Amino acid sequence: HPRSSAASDVYKRQGVHTRYNNVDLVIIRENTEGLYSGVENEVTPGVVMSMKVATQKGCERIGRWAFRFANRRERRKITVLHKANIMKMTDGLFLNCAAHVHENDYPNLQFETAIIDAGCMRLVQDPSQFDVLLLENLYGDVVSDLCAGLVGGLGVVPGANFGDEEAIFEAVSYTHL
């Protein structure tokens, strides 16, 4: 896999009617691991399994990328949304790598964590409390769409996928016409 990070800039656009006028956040999503790795198999007829992949290298890479991005853009706080209370190993690794990068390289930035369920509730209650969200692949996909809904829909939020040597820019998700 080429290394890839996704960033979505979520803010209120002029001329787009929304419930919220105070949204200004960035979503940083790890884009190659997690359940979207495509590692699935049929254990026995009628029973299938999907494997969630998390590597220390991938988790540290996206953590560094997110903190460097936040620092360069003069953002103040990174919030990691996770489910480490249930997925202790995979989400635990993601969370621990982000905390390690914060403590060792970017102590000047604020750092908080939230369980994904509670984080989504907080997002719809008051999105202004967030600045940069750092998420693993599946959570980032879902939360990007949720946040697009806060500011007018999928077609109004720009997204970028950054690889080692190339980048792709697009709307956060496809839209149905």
Regions found by a protein language model. Name each.
Residues 1-7, 11, 176:
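Single conserved hydrophobic/aromatic residue that forms the stacking wall/gate
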Residues 16-21, 43, 71-72, 103-105, ...:
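Solvent-exposed alpha-helices and their adjacent loops that cap or buttress functional pockets
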Residues 47-114:
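Glycine-rich phosphate/diphosphate-binding loop of Rossmann-like nucleotide-binding domains
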Residues 123-177:
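Glycine-rich phosphate/nucleotide-binding loop
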Residues 20-24, 32, 73-76, 106-109, ...:
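Short coil/turn connectors at secondary-structure junctions
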